C-alpha cells in the first residue's frame, strides 16, 4: 500500500526563483532517506502561487522509517528552521498524509508534467460503489492518454481527513485538452452521469491542476 506526505506552500511575491531553489534543496535532504519526491506549482483551482511538495513511499513502514530518520537528521532540522523563518521565500500553509486505496487494477506507469486532482467526500455506506466508479474513471483516463491514475484517501489532513482524492497525470496541456475532449464522447458522458444523480456515491469538493517543476 503506497502512502504519501504532502506540504502546501505559498510563495511570497517576487520570490518564485528562490522558492524553487529551496524546494530543490529540500528534495535532496528528504530524498536521501527514501521516497519519490516531486514539486508542483498551482495551475488552476488552487490559490495563486501555491506549491505542492509531495513524497510517495511504497508502504507505511517505509514512511515510518524515513520519518524516524528525518527526525534525527540535524542538517534537515536546521534547514526546516530556515524555511520557517522570516526570510524564507515560501510560507508553509498545510501538511497532509494519506494512502492509496486499492481499486483492483494496476495503474499505467509513468509521470506527466500536469497533475489533475479531484477531491470528493464519500457518502455514508457508499465506499464499495465509490471505489468501483473510481476504477472506471481511472481506466477511462488512462485509455485517453493519462498515466498513474489512482484514488487516495487523506488520513491526516485536518478538516479534510477522510476525503478521497482521484488523481492522474498527463504529458502537457495539449494532452489535457485531448482528455477533456474525450469526456464529451458517449463513453465519457455516460461516466460523468454516474456522479450527477440525486444520490451519488460521492460529492465533489474541489478540482485542481498542478504543473510539475523539475528539481
State what each model feature region is.
Residues 1-215:
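Short S/T/G/P-rich N-terminal loop/turn motif that feeds into the first structured element of a domain
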Amino acid at each position: 500500500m503506497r502512502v504519501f506526505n504532502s506540504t502546501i506552500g505559498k510563495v511570497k511575491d517576487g520570490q518564485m526563483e528562490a522558492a524553487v531553489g529551496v524546494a530543490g534543496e529540500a528534495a535532496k535532504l528528504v530524498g536521501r532517506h527514501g521516497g519519490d519526491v516531486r514539486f508542483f506549482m498551482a495551475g488552476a483551482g488552487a490559490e495563486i502561487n501555491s506549491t505542492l511538495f509531495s513524497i510517495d513511499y511504497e508502504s507505511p513502514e517505509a514512511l515510518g522509517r524515513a520519518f524516524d530518520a528525518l527526525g534525527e537528521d540535524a542538517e534537515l532540522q536546521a534547514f526546516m528552521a530556515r524555511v520557517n523563518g522570516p526570510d524564507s521565500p515560501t510560507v508553509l500553509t498545510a501538511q497532509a498524509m494519506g494512502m492509496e486505496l486499492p481499486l483492483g487494477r494496476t495503474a499505467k506507469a509513468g509521470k506527466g508534467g500536469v497533475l489533475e486532482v479531484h477531491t470528493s467526500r464519500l457518502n455514508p455506506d457508499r465506499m464499495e460503489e465509490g471505489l468501483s466508479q473510481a476504477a472506471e474513471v481511472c481506466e477511462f483516463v488512462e485509455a485517453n492518454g493519462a498515466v498513474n491514475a489512482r484514488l487516495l484517501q487523506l488520513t491526516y489532513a485536518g478538516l479534510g481527513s477522510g476525503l478521497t482524492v482521484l488523481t492522474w497525470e498527463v504529458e502537457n496541456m495539449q494532452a489535457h485538452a485531448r482528455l477533456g475532449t474525450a469526456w464529451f464522447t458517449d463513453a465519457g458522458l455516460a461516466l460523468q452521469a454516474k456522479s450527477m444523480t440525486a444520490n451519488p456515491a460521492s460529492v465533489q469538493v474541489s478540482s485542481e491542476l498542478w504543473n510539475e517543476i523539475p528539481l
